[in-house]
Amino acid sequence: MRLLFMATLGQTLHEVTLGLDLAAQLKDAGIDAHFVVDRYNKGQLDAAGHPYTLVDTSMGPGVREVVAGAVRRARPDAIVLSDYMAHWLTHVVNYRTDPWFVDDFGPPVIPIDSVNLENTGLELELLGRPTLVSDRILTAPAHLLPVPANRPDATGGRGLPYRAARTPAPPSEAARKELRRSLGVRDGERLLMLPTLPWQRIMQTQAGPLTRELAVRVPRLVGRYLRRLPSHTRFLAVGPYLEGFGLPEDRLRVEESYTAERYASLLGASDAVLALFLPSFALERAVLADVPGLFTVNTFDVDGEPGLRLLSDAFGGVSPAVRSWLAAFPGPVPPFHMWPLRWNAVVSRLLEANPLTTTALRAELLDEESVVAGLEAVLYDPGVRDRLAGARADYRDAITGLPETVEVFLTAARRCGVTV
């Protein structure tokens, strides 16, 4: 069987990694893959060894012809969307074309759905406005639900949970120690990974007013929290280092560009990871790499004094730094899960009864004491670290209990009309 993977969203590794990890698990069954990816991801494909076709947003609607050429060369039995929402989003916004031109090529389309849209809903924020993702996923004969971040026991629809990746072998203690040494981490120090993405920096200047303000101002608040951590905490910024963080230079290492392999190594060398947005590739891979984490959300709509009273009642008080931050914010602060975007409906439902949330601590971003205490706990508290390690082990056991990925994929392929 031959597959064409569509993974054209640029400025991120996540979607291409989803496709590559699936292709790696299918390769032993004699299933070949050809990828269509953004130029940003060329290095990933070179390392993986799959044939590929490069695209970029300057092509606009002309991307259709480039993909048509890839289809002619690869002669796929099916087209895999890696993933559904990213495919829809990048073609609507960046390529200004109908995402479903892929139907014109003939082979059945099999979507990967990283957030289980069938059960989480289709509403999200796009360019500052509420938008509905294409509902095609609701009538697809089958789609694939990667775990993590989906629930291993996700049922009640056409989605089929599968292992997103093989659990990587942990680095040897000697290799981990050498990498930490190269990052400037001394014995007795802790390393906190702080992942960001290029599009988050872009949104500091090129987004709707509210999204732009969140993109600029949240790092200032987070930087305040991080500077309160013990002085033997070091910071590893993976991705663009956003100016507002203001972290001490003598304890900061920035890795703005990296390969997928380097990213995995950096994660494995860290003592904990902080996720400011969900879904979080770092948090998902931290489960497999056995690294604890903390993720933040804001579930409060904060508008003036009534909003402050709401926060105070919920948190037992509001810190002076948060009060000052809110006072300087130009208008109400909305709830958000995927900072600096909101995406509340989709992400909040993805988290419901999801055992992934037990593998890391959760904190409300505007609760300063909760965030700081949580970060200190995941970095330094043996009891908390052991509890989270147990939850990660349970989650990995649940992943191991899933059917073999080849079996799941072939089931989806048959339902979508592929002759197997």
Predicted segments with their positions:
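Conserved catalytic-core segment of nucleotide-activated headgroup transferases in glycan assembly
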Residues: L22, A164-G244
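Conserved nucleotide-sugar phosphate-binding/catalytic loop shared by glycosyltransferases and other
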Residues: F5-G10, Q25-R75
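A short, glycine/small-residue-rich beta-strand->loop->alpha-helix junction that serves as a flexible
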Residues: M6-L20, H87-L89, Q200-L210
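Short N-terminal targeting/anchoring amphipathic segment
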Residues: A70-H91, D271-L276
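C-terminal alpha-helical cap of glycosyltransferases
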Residues: D367-Y380, A398-V420
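Donor nucleotide-activated moiety binding/catalytic core segment of transferases
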Residues: V63-V66, V238-A289, G293-L294, T299
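Active-site-proximal region of nucleotide-activated glycan assembly enzymes
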Residues: F101-P171, G317-A328
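Catalytic binding pocket for nucleotide-activated donors in carbohydrate/polymer assembly enzymes
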Residues: F281-R387, Y395
